[in-house]
From Swiss-Prot:
Protein name: Late embryogenesis abundant protein M17
Region of interest (4 X 22 AA repeats, Cys-rich), residue spans: 76-262
UniProt entry keywords in alphabetical sequence: Glycoprotein, Repeat, Signal
Entry function: May be involved in the acquisition of desiccation tolerance during late phase of embryogenesis.
Biased composition, class Gly residues, residue ranges: 173-184, 228-239
Each Sequence repeat, start to end: 76-97, 131-152, 186-207, 241-262
Induction entry: Induced by cold stress.
Cystines in this chain: none
Region of interest: Disordered: 163-184, 218-239
One of the GO biological process terms: embryo development ending in seed dormancy
Upper taxonomic lineage: Eukaryota, Viridiplantae, Streptophyta, Embryophyta, Tracheophyta
Glycosylation sites: N23
Signal peptide: 1-22
Length: 280
């Protein structure tokens, strides 16, 4: 009996030892596999913090670079001209070079220009400063037509305040008649380098060199041979700008750059202006 009790005690001790060893091994395995809660939070924080920094860097890289407005006048406030849109009479994107400016001019379609609406002026040709638009021209010019007409009187007034008086030479002459000296030059000292409205030049040449440059760019074939006089006395063609059916384009030194080819074309121009004037 004594030997039997001893064997039972040894068996119990062995079983207890095996159970304790198994529990110790399981605890060690769990400690190696599972990371601590603090380490997990630290890793997630690093992942989230990295995304805003990358997004901010991308936004800064995509920001457009706009050249500061350097001047004002026929070039839209840019050195070589405006190659982008307009906002309140200021260019959003200035041409970087003369080559880029020339490329933009070649791609300007007639439909890109808002239909000219006609000025409210009368008598003394008050609409000249309005550039053929109801409230004035707030953008650039192309072939004697405004690229962007002011949308309201307030916008036009804001543009007028930013234009320096020296940018446009005061109109000096009349509309011709008798021996009106300035009539042939459109009321300007060196000639008219812009469009016309009611017999007055919209933009006077700054110098003789600028006037000569404009003359060289006008192709003779673009202008129908002038058939009438420049006014004065009872010159029949004077009122039509020296054209049989009227002038459908710009003017230069009192002569039309593009004459209407037919009475129908002349009527179409008149109807367009009258329709725009009738709008509220």
């Amino acid at each position: 009996m004594g030997n039997l009790k001893s064997l039972v005690l040894l068996a119990l001790l062995f079983s207890f030892s095996v159970a304790v060893f198994a529990n110790t091994s399981n605890d060690a395995t769990h400690d190696e596999v599972k990371p601590s809660t603090e380490a997990t939070h630290a890793i997630e924080a690093q992942k989230h913090d990295g995304k805003p920094q990358i997004a901010e860097a991308q936004v800064e890289a995509n920001d457009p670079v706009v050249e500061p407005q350097q001047d004002w006048g026929g070039r839209g406030g840019c050195r070589w001209g405006c190659c982008g849109g307009w906002w309140r009479g200021r260019c959003r994107y200035c041409c970087r070079s003369q080559a880029e400016a020339s490329e933009v001019v070649e791609t300007v379609e007639p439909n890109d220009v808002e239909p000219q609406q006609g000025g409210r002026g009368g008598g003394g040709g008050g609409g000249g400063g309005r550039g053929g638009c109801r409230w004035g021209c707030c953008g650039g010019w192309w072939r004697g037509r405004c690229r962007y007409c002011c949308r309201s009187q307030a916008e036009a007034s804001e543009v007028v305040e930013t234009v320096e008086p020296n940018d446009v030479e005061p109109q000096q002459g009349g509309r011709g008649g008798g021996g009106g000296g300035g009539g042939g030059r459109g009321g300007c000292r060196w000639g008219c380098c812009g469009g016309w409205w009611r017999g007055r030049c919209r933009y006077c040449c700054r110098s003789q060199a600028e006037a000569s440059e404009v003359v060289e760019t006008v192709e003779p074939n673009d202008v129908e041979p002038q058939q009438g006089g420049r006014g004065g006395g009872g010159g029949g063609g004077g009122g039509r700008g020296g054209c049989r059916w009227g002038c459908c384009g710009g003017w230069w030194r009192g002569r039309c750059r593009y004459c209407c080819r037919s009475q129908a074309e002349a009527n179409e121009v008149v109807e367009t202006v009258e329709a725009q004037q009738a709008k509220p």
